Amino acid sequence: MFITRWLFSTNHKDIGTLYLLFGAWSGLIGACLSILMRMELTQPGSLLGSDQIFNVLVTAHAFIMIFFMVMPIMIGGFGNWLIPLMIGAPDMAFPRMNNMSFWLLPPALLLLLSSSYVEAGAGTGWTVYPPLSGNLVHSGPSVDLAIFSLHLAGASSILGAINFITTCINMKPKSMPMFNMPLFVWSVLITAIMLLLALPVLAAAITMLLTDRNLNTSFFDPCGGGDPVLFQHLFWFFGHPEVYILILPGFGIISSIITFYTGKKNTFGYTSMIWAMMSIAILGFVVWAHHMFTVGLDIDSRAYFTAATMIIAIPTGIKVFGWLATLAGGQIKWQTPIYWALGFIFLFTVGGMTGIILANSSLDIVLHDTYYVVAHFHYVLSMGAVFAIMGGLTHWFPLFTGYTLNQTMTKTQFWVMFVGVNMTFFPQHFLGLSGMPRRYSDFPDAFTLWNTMSSIGSTISMVAVLMSLFIVWEALTCKREVQMPLGKKTHVEWFFGSPPPYHTHTEPSFMLNNTYAPIRNLISYMEWPWPEK
């Protein structure tokens, strides 16, 4: 029974739970790697004893956090659990393919960890640039294992993307227009389309790297007429859409949370929010070379990529102001998820500001590969994506389990995490502006103060992570049942109880004349019997 339920599962709720648990476990590994890096960088001088080991930590931390934490939790976990509930589908379109999408991930993680255990490990950074990743500099099977790991994780994501696209378009009720789907469903649909377009390019790039290393081709070797810059173009054509893939489902989660806890019928500017996400997705594919301002692009290329990158700020700003307008005039219920959502808006906007600065090709010449860049993308990932994940977990935990979290503990954990991540990454702006380069295991004494502060902040963040584990354990142990507020009647995933039955529907829902929108207008929002805690 256990094996048939969890290994051969075709149930979207069980597979979503597997994704969430796997993502949490991987996230702990990634967090431990980051703590090791911050220990090395707390003071000048060597702690780990080898620059190669440090670079292996950097590489593994990035891969684990991106491919085995954020994507499985946001797309695999929340996507699987919520999308069938939100569109009234019995399950995902391809349930067995869904299961395979998940079970490709543990072997991929195993391959990635193995790459660190053999020879010297893959110390290339997550960008895997040749010639550093070539077989002269990284001899031995480490990089090959990392490449195979990426192949498996990529195959998993592509299969999942096909599944989500088919589900969102084909399995909603015939009378529900696309523009009546919840924003979270839209965000995952757009994310899946981006995955489907971006990942094959990465697969091509790393396959060429694999043959360069093992079959004596010279795609990226100038001696044979290749060009290492070609790899950078291929990699970043995947890599830039990837960072939007990481944040878009977070946008959907934040939209759900803010609409829910402000007691609004709908997010402000619902269609504009969808168009903004579409614009971000399209623009995300045409700005990749802003990661390459220092490799010697033409002046006109630099002008174009600077301008195009700045244009992405417009739809992003539309989303931020959409959230603020949703908050405006709402009867805000101050439960933990709205804390995470407000933290997301503030810190994601700060990260966006530094992104605008880095978009200037002239400034980026100086700031490229410094800690300024690290601070920028950790503000949008460590305080954007992760805050969205934490908000989603605290919001939907009662739906997934049927038990409520302790509000006092979750709020305390939010503040500890908030202080920790800001203390970790804000000083890194100063380090970058002072010229401290990324991916180095040691630094001049002049940088000691901010590095020490950053490391203290990372310890605080780690305490917050451990608190979150305790909070989940406490909720599952105390078993406080959920009392459903009527306010959830506009959020269709809550219709079926907490937790919903194992099989929510036996067939796709039927909806006459699009009853979805009018029902929203009939419900009064001023008299919600909210529970106190």
UniProtKB/Swiss-Prot annotation:
It comes from the Eukaryota. Cu cation binds at H240, H290, H291. InterPro entries: Cyt_c_oxase-like_su1_dom, Cyt_c_oxase-like_su1_sf, Cyt_C_Oxase_1, Cyt_c_Oxase_su1_BS, Cyt_c_oxase_su1_dom. O2 binds at Y244. Residues 1-11, 87-94, 171-182, 262-269, 328-335, 401-406, 479-533 are mitochondrial matrix. Keywords: Calcium, Copper, Electron transport, Heme, Iron, Magnesium, Membrane, Metal-binding, Mitochondrion, Mitochondrion inner membrane, Respiratory chain, Sodium, Translocase, Transmembrane, Transmembrane helix, Transport. Gene3D superfamilies: Cytochrome c oxidase-like, subunit I domain (1.20.210.10). The chain crosses the membrane at residues 12-40, 51-86, 95-117, 141-170, 183-212, 228-261, 270-286, 299-327, 336-357, 371-400, 407-433, 447-478. Fe(II)-heme a binds at H61, H378. There is a cross-link at H240-Y244 (1'-histidyl-3'-tyrosine (His-Tyr)). Its main location: mitochondrion. It holds the Pfam family COX1. GO terms for cellular component: mitochondrial inner membrane; respiratory chain complex IV. Binds 2 heme A groups non-covalently per subunit. This is Cytochrome c oxidase subunit 1. One of its GO terms (biological process) is electron transport coupled proton transport. Residues 41-50, 118-140, 213-227, 287-298, 358-370, 434-446 are mitochondrial intermembrane. Component of the cytochrome c oxidase, the last enzyme in the mitochondrial electron transport chain which drives oxidative phosphorylation. The respiratory chain contains 3 multisubunit complexes succinate dehydrogenase (complex II, CII), ubiquinol-cytochrome c oxidoreductase (cytochrome b-c1 complex, complex III, CIII) and cytochrome c oxidase (complex IV, CIV), that cooperate to transfer electrons derived from NADH and succinate to molecular oxygen, creating an electrochemical gradient over the inner membrane that drives transmembrane transport and the ATP synthase. Pathway: Energy metabolism; oxidative phosphorylation. Heme a3 binds at H376.
